[in-house]
């Protein structure tokens, strides 16, 4: 198979995967609440994978908090998924000193598998109002970049 054909096929498969509806995920946050993607129909859902030791992750947390606060109860939900922690207490202690306004899940790669691959931290997945995965990014995201993406979408 030629390189061009393989590259084209890979690009098509990635595009197909990105536009596929996500299977409903089940996430339990640190407050004991259960979150399903289907619970948020009609809203954009940003799932952000991060770690307490990850400097780029920590840098993006204030922007994600501002994004959540600006859209809380309206058109967008943020769910943080803490990854690669030595114990749950490390994350809980972090949240006591640096509380986040949005739900935080104690994650692992089994939980991540429900949403998508996490090859680096931070990684974010954005689902539209119908539950379709419309964007993913390895590396930090900003409030401005998420809002610009949503504004440019025909679904907003």
Which ranges hold each PLM region?
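Hydrophobic beta-strand core positions in alpha/beta domains
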Residues: 46-48, 80-82, 125-126
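A short beta-strand-turn-helix
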Residues: 25-45, 68-71, 115
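Short pre-active-site segment immediately N-terminal to redox-active cysteine/selenocysteine motifs
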Residues: 43-45, 49-53, 120
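Thiol/disulfide oxidoreductase modules built on the thioredoxin-like
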Residues: 93-101, 106-151
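N-terminal signal peptide c-region/cleavage motif recognized by signal peptidases
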Residues: 17-19
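Bacterial N-terminal signal peptides that target proteins for export
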Residues: 1-9
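Structural microenvironment flanking redox-active thiols in thiol-disulfide oxidoreductases
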Residues: 58-98, 109-112
